[in-house]
Curated annotation (Swiss-Prot):
Domain KH type-2 as annotated: residue spans: 47-118
Organism annotation: Crucihimalaya wallichii (Rock-cress)
Location(s), subcellular: Plastid, Chloroplast
Gene Ontology process terms (BP): translation
Pfam family, one: Ribosomal_S3_C
Family: Belongs to the universal ribosomal protein uS3 family.
GO annotation, cellular component aspect: chloroplast; cytosolic small ribosomal subunit
Keywords: Chloroplast, Plastid, Ribonucleoprotein, Ribosomal protein, RNA-binding, rRNA-binding
Name of the protein: Small ribosomal subunit protein uS3c
Length: 218
């Protein structure tokens, strides 16, 4: 059987870069990792609670964390940043306070920046969120997959593969369904491939969603 490696880890250093940039002593490494998870969870929870688009999406593509001795710089890449920027200073300050409270960091300055993605639906995380919303609303999985592919075509991507696994449409036996459009060269390291795997809770149980998007070839 083919062993499937994570496409992002496979391409680190060539077409993909790390989402956390910092150095730590070996003994302190786990603390840094835990801190990163707290930051990401805190931001996602805040966005979920306070901001809702009509379709119920957060629109966060990724969160990059850069740490220096006296500063933690957080860059949030969003597909729909106007949600956080509508009354920008208040929203961002509130988010900053929440993260600082969560981390309990006294001697470090925290800075949050928000960057807009030019093609939101060319990002697998936002697409996975879109599909999850559709499945929760009991839209047929095939319809949701096809709609997602239509949205990526507008974002000028070269190929996409979408896979949904679990008790699809409430069937007794779990199965895997997938659909591919265009090229998705997973074995080519030079190919810039974005990948996301997430879960969605439906009334029948948990479904797994995986999305591969072939963005460009270097």
């Amino acid at each position: 059987m083919g062993q499937k490696i994570n496409p992002l880890g496979f391409r680190l250093g060539t077409t993909q870069s790390h989402h956390s940039l910092w150095f730590a002593q070996p003994k302190k490494y786990s603390e840094g990792l835990e801190e990163d998870k707290k930051i990401r969870d805190c931001i996602k929870n805040y966005v979920q609670k306070n901001i809702r688009i009509s379709s119920g999406m957060e629109g966060i593509a990724r969160i990059e964390i850069q740490k220096r001795i006296d500063l933690i710089q957080i860059i949030i890449y969003m597909g729909f940043p106007k949600l956080l920027i509508e009354d920008k200073p208040r929203r961002v300050e509130e988010l900053q306070m929440n993260v600082q409270k969560e981390l309990n960091c006294v001697n470090k300055k925290l800075n949050i920046a928000i960057t807009r993605i030019s093609n939101p639906y060319g990002d697998p995380n936002i697409l996975a969120e879109f599909i999850a919303g559709q499945l929760k609303n009991r839209v047929s999985f095939r319809k949701a997959m096809k709609k997602a592919i239509e949205l990526t075509e507008q974002a000028n991507t070269k190929g996409i593969q979408v896979q949904i696994a679990g008790r699809i449409d409430g069937k007794e036996i779990a199965r895997v369904e997938w659909i591919r459009e265009g090229r998705v060269p997973l074995q080519t390291i030079e190919a810039k491939i974005d990948y996301c795997s997430s879960t969605v809770r439906t009334i029948y149980g948990v479904l797994g969603i995986k999305i591969w998007i072939f963005v460009d070839e270097d």
